[in-house]
Structure formats: structure tokens, C-alpha cells
């Protein structure tokens, strides 16, 4: 079974705002810094581009459940989890996910993925594009 992903409204808004912000910073810095060396704008452009396209490349685009694996498809490097490693599956309500803290991950730009933690569930790894219907 294959399932396509779609962004929730918050992820859409965050993605649009970050895209506009990065574009304004990249274009604006070159117009403001004319007489100085171009090393700072070039470095900033490379850094913001790496952040943006790196995040884009690792976002979940679909999920596939096979007889032996759960596959999270991403533009780069699919995640494959053996079904034998999955201890249980349950739908999580907002209360269980409340106060989740992003330890190392993305919280809105093209989705929500990476390492998160909260007091109720402990350490979690997310590969999500929506905050509702969490499993």
C-alpha cells in the first residue's frame, strides 16, 4: 500500500514564508553590498541554498507499506524500517504530542522530520508532513 503526503496549513505557511525570506535575503544582500567584496553575500547564498535544498531533499513525499518493510520515500535516501522492528502502532492524539521539542530536525519547512522529544513519549523520530492524524 502506498500513501502520498500533503503538507498541513502550518507547514505550507512556514514553507512560503521561509522561501520568501531566503529569496529576499539573497537578492537584497547583493544589492546592498556593492563596493565591498562579494565573499559575504556568496557565503550567505551558499549557506541558505544548502539549508533550503537540503531540507527539500530529505522531506517525506510518500509512504509505502510492504509485507516486510515500511518505506518512507524521500527525494534523497529513502528510509526503510523492517516491520519486525516496529513494536506497536497507535494513533496519537494532540495531548500525547503536546510540548514536543525539536531536538534535531525540521519543524515546518516542507514538513516535520527529525528527532523530537516530550515528557509523555520520550525520544521520537518523525517523518511527517501533517501534525494531525499522527501514528
Task: Give residue spans per PLM region.
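Non-transmembrane, membrane-adjacent beta-strand/coil modules in membrane-associated proteins
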Residues: 73-135
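Conserved beta-hairpin
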Residues: 46-90
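Hydrophobic alpha-helical transmembrane segments
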Residues: 34-46
Amino acid at each position: 500500500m502506498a500513501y502520498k503526503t500533503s503538507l498541513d496549513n502550518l507547514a505550507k505557511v512556514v514553507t512560503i514564508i521561509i522561501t520568501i525570506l531566503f529569496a529576499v535575503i539573497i537578492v537584497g544582500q547583493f544589492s546592498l553590498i556593492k563596493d565591498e567584496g562579494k565573499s559575504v553575500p556568496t557565503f550567505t547564498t551558499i549557506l541558505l541554498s544548502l539549508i533550503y535544498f537540503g531540507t527539500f531533499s530529505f522531506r517525506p513525499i510518500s509512504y509505502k507499506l510492504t509485507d516486510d518493510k515500511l518505506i518512507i520515500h524521500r527525494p534523497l535516501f529513502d528510509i526503510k524500517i523492517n516491520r519486525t522492528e516496529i513494536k506497536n502502532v497507535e494513533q496519537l492524539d494532540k495531548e500525547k504530542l503536546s510540548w514536543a521539542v525539536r531536538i534535531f530536525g525540521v519543524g515546518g519547512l516542507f514538513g516535520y522530520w527529525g528527532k523530537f522529544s516530550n515528557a509523555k513519549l520520550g525520544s521520537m523520530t518523525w517523518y511527517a508532513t501533517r501534525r494531525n492524524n499522527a501514528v
